[in-house]
């Protein structure tokens, strides 16, 4: 009798231990199931070249691209790194939100400035016209050179591009910090490079609102967009890429096609009227 009771007690003890182990393993297996599935996708971090292209497209007016346009943009961005259609979609969505927020901030700032107009006008009258002269008589930036164009073979921008600090590289090495909203910083630093007077000068691809406008070529020019900025280029003659932007630069059409150059670094085909191009570096 004692043996039977002892055996029953041992069986019950083992069952209790098994149930306790199962209860302890259940939460662990549940947590493991939730974390052992598809790993959490890391946030897409676009490269500077991808940001430049996205900003140029957004600034050209395409703020909400359709599905087919999103796919075209994604194929263009894939030349510089992995990207998905969803990444492009959400980038434009976030970019529109930032634009609306900035517009509200500017509207509030303008509303506050309305109350200060009388004092500002009085201060401007007392200060004279020196600032006005400085603003409207700044020296123009050097135009881009064209191949075989003679005296008129230049590319001029409809909006001036302010110069930034020159460096030994086509792309800027440093990007100024400016918070989450300052996404333009990388694009501003990735300036177009023009060679003039034996030195290398970097010009920002985005026009400053206070910069002076360069003059148009009177005749024989067409308008193209390079990095979101409108430029007037001679209708005849190909762009001297090596002489204008350096051997490390190349032009990419908005369709994703890289424009070919000859052994001298001159574009084989002329730029087309109204088309969009992006200036990027070959060393990426």
From Swiss-Prot:
Superkingdom classification of source: Eukaryota
Family: Belongs to the WUS homeobox family.
Species in which this protein is naturally found: Oryza sativa subsp. japonica (Rice)
Known function: Transcription factor which may be involved in developmental processes.
Any one annotated GO CC term: nucleus
MF-aspect GO terms: DNA binding; DNA-binding transcription factor activity
Main location: nucleus
Keywords on record: Developmental protein, DNA-binding, Homeobox, Nucleus, Transcription, Transcription regulation
Localization annotation: Nucleus
SMART domains: HOX
One Pfam family named in its UniProt record: Homeodomain
GO biological process, one term: adventitious root development
Protein name listed in UniProt: WUSCHEL-related homeobox 10
DNA-binding region: 39-103
Key word NADP present: no
Coiled-coil parts of chain: none
Gene: WOX10
Keyword set includes Transcription: yes
Segments of this protein annotated with the region Disordered: 1-43
């Amino acid at each position: 009798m004692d043996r039977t009771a002892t055996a029953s007690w041992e069986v019950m003890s083992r069952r209790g231990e098994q149930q306790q182990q199962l209860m302890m393993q259940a939460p662990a297996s549940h947590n493991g199931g939730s974390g052992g599935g598809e790993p959490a996708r890391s946030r897409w971090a676009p490269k500077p070249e991808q940001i430049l292209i996205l900003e140029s497209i957004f600034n050209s007016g395409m703020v909400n691209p359709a599905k087919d346009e999103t796919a075209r943009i994604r194929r263009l961005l894939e030349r510089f790194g992995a990207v998905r259609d969803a990444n492009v979609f959400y980038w434009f969505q976030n970019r529109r939100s930032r634009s609306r927020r900035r517009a509200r901030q500017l509207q509030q700032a303008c509303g506050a400035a309305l109350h200060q107009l009388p004092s500002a006008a009085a201060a401007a009258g007392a200060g004279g016209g020196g600032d006005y002269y400085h603003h409207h008589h700044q020296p123009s930036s050097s135009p881009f050179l064209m191949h075989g164009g003679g005296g008129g073979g230049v590319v001029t921008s409809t909006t001036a591009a302010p110069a930034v600090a020159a460096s030994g590289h086509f792309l800027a090495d440093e990007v100024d910090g400016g918070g989450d909203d300052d996404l333009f910083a990388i694009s501003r630093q990735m300036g177009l490079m023009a060679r003039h007077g034996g030195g290398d000068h970097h010009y920002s691809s985005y026009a400053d609102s206070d910069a002076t406008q360069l003059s148009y070529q009177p005749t024989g020019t067409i308008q193209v967009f390079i990095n979101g900025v409108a430029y007037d280029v001679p209708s005849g003659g190909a762009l001297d890429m090596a002489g204008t932007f350096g051997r490390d630069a190349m032009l990419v059409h908005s369709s994703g096609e890289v424009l070919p150059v000859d052994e001298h670094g001159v574009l084989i085909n002329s730029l087309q009227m109204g088309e969009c191009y992006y200036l990027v570096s070959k060393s990426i």
